[in-house]
From Swiss-Prot:
GO terms for cellular component: cytosolic large ribosomal subunit. Residues 1-20 are annotated as: Disordered. The keyword rRNA-binding applies. This is Large ribosomal subunit protein uL3. InterPro entries: L3_arc_euk (IPR045077), Ribosomal_L3_dom_3_arc_sf (IPR044892), Ribosomal_uL3 (IPR000597), Ribosomal_uL3_arc (IPR019928), Ribosomal_uL3_CS (IPR019926), Transl_B-barrel_sf (IPR009000). GO terms for molecular function: RNA binding; rRNA binding; structural constituent of ribosome. The gene is rpl3. The lineage of its organism: Archaea, Methanobacteriati, Methanobacteriota, Stenosarchaea group, Methanomicrobia. It holds the Pfam family Ribosomal_L3. GO terms for biological process: translation. One of the primary rRNA binding proteins, it binds directly near the 3'-end of the 23S rRNA, where it nucleates assembly of the 50S subunit. Part of the 50S ribosomal subunit. Forms a cluster with proteins L14 and L24e.
Length: 337
C-alpha cells in the first residue's frame, strides 16, 4: 500500500500572498557598524542576466582554483543623492523621527515624487539634531536618499525612487558628523561597496496576477473520476463541516507574484563604470544598453528587468571575505536567440 504521508503543498511562510504596497522594497533592520563611516545601502535597476568565466576561489571546493562558469545578474547603479538627515528616538511603541534636515539644492524631478519641504535654516536644524544627540534623546541617525533614473536609457522614467538608508559608524556622533559631509551630495556605488563583498538584496518579484491553486500552491490535479466531475484544477475540499468557515490555510486562487523578497549574502563579483563591458550584442532584452556604472551579482535577483533593486550590507554574514574574484571572461553574446 502506498504511503499516505507527503509534504504539505505550498508554504504558509509568506502568507498573506498579496501585492506589495510599493515597488520600492523596504529594509526593516540594519547591520552593526564596522569600519569607516559610510552608507549601508544602495539602489540600482535590474538589467538582465549573463554569465562569466572565473577562477573558483571557494575554499575546499572540488573545483577550487579551476575555471568555472557562473551566472550573474547585471544591475545598473547610477549615483544616488542624499536628500536629508533624519534623527530617531525610541519609545515604548518603537522608533519615531523627531528631527530632520533637508538639503538645499535638490533635483527638480524629486517634486514629481514628494512635495519638497520649504527651505529653512539648515545650520539651525543641524545644531538642533546635535543638541538632541548630546542630551541622549536620539537612538539612530539615518539618511534619506533617492535615485536618478533620468540618466538611464533602459529605464523609461524620470521620477526618482526615494528611500531611507542606515549609516555605518561606531557611535551616533560619528554618524552625525559623516551625514553632514554627504548631505546634498552624490554618492556612487564604489563609495558603498567593493568587489567580492557580500550584500543582501531586496526587490519586488514579477507579478503574475490572479492564478489558480495548482500554479499558486502546487496542489495536485484531481485524479480518476473526480477529474471528470467538472473540477480538474481545484482543491479537493475546503475543509470540515465544523467549524463552519473556510480556513485561511486552504489553498485557493488569488494574487501570485509582486511580493517583496529579501535574499541574504549575494556576492558582488564586479563593479564597473563602462557598460560596454557587459552589454551583449543588440542590448539586453526589455532593457537595452548599459551606459554607466553597474555591478555584477552572483546568481539571480528577484524581479523583472527595469525593477528597482536595493542592496544592503549583509545582516547575517556567515562567509569570510573571499576578496576580489578573478574574472577571466564576461559573456557578451546576443540574448535575442
Amino acid at each position: 500500500m502506498a504511503s499516505i504521508h507527503r509534504p504539505k503543498r505550498g508554504s504558509l511562510a509568506f502568507s498573506p500572498r498579496k501585492r506589495a504596497k510599493s515597488h520600492i522594497p523596504r529594509f526593516r533592520a540594519w547591520p552593526e557598524a564596522t569600519g569607516e563611516p559610510k552608507l549601508q545601502s544602495f539602489a540600482g535597476y535590474k538589467v538582465g542576466m549573463t554569465h562569466v568565466i572565473m577562477v573558483d576561489d571557494t575554499k575546499n571546493s572540488l573545483t577550487q582554483g579551476m575555471e568555472i562558469s557562473v551566472p550573474v545578474t547585471v544591475i545598473e547603479t547610477p549615483a544616488i543623492r542624499v536628500a536629508a538627515i533624519r534623527a530617531y528616538a525610541e519609545d515604548s511603541t518603537g522608533e519615531k523621527a523627531i528631527a530632520e534636515v533637508w538639503a538645499a539644492d535638490l533635483d527638480p524631478e524629486l517634486k514629481r515624487r514628494i512635495p519638497i519641504p520649504a527651505a529653512g535654516n539648515q545650520a539651525e536644524a543641524l545644531e538642533n539634531i546635535g543638541k538632541l544627540i548630546e542630551e541622549g534623546r536620539v537612538s539612530d541617525v539615518r539618511a534619506v536618499i533617492y535615485t536618478l533614473p533620468k540618466s538611464l536609457t533602459g529605464v523609461p522614467k524620470k521620477v526618482p525612487d526615494i528611500m531611507e538608508s542606515g549609516i555605518s559608524a561606531r557611535d551616533l556622533g560619528t554618524k552625525f558628523e559623516y551625514s553632514k559631509t554627504i548631505l546634498g551630495t552624490l554618492v556612487s556605488v564604489t563609495d558603498v561597496f567593493k568587489n567580492g563583498t557580500l550584500v543582501d538584496t531586496a526587490a519586488i518579484t514579477i507579478g503574475k496576477g490572479t492564478q489558480g491553486p495548482v500554479k499558486r500552491w502546487g496542489i495536485q490535479l484531481m485524479k480518476g473520476k473526480h477529474s471528470r466531475q467538472g473540477s480538474l484544477r481545484q482543491v479537493g475540499t475546503l475543509g470540515a463541516f465544523n467549524p463552519s468557515r473556510v480556513s485561511w490555510r486552504v489553498p485557493q486562487m488569488g494574487q501570485m507574484g509582486y511580493h517583496q523578497r529579501t535574499e541574504f549574502n549575494k556576492r558582488i563579483l564586479k563593479i564597473g563604470s563602462d557598460g560596454e563591458e557587459v552589454t551583449p550584442e543588440g542590448g539586453f532584452i526589455n532593457y537595452g544598453l548599459v551606459r554607466g556604472d553597474y555591478i555584477l551579482i552572483k546568481g539571480s535577483v528577484p524581479g523583472p528587468s527595469k525593477r528597482l533593486i536595493r542592496l544592503r550590507d549583509p545582516i547575517r554574514a556567515k562567509k569570510a571575505d573571499l576578496g576580489e574574484p578573478n574574472i577571466l571572461y564576461i559573456s557578451r553574446e546576443s540574448k535575442q536567440g
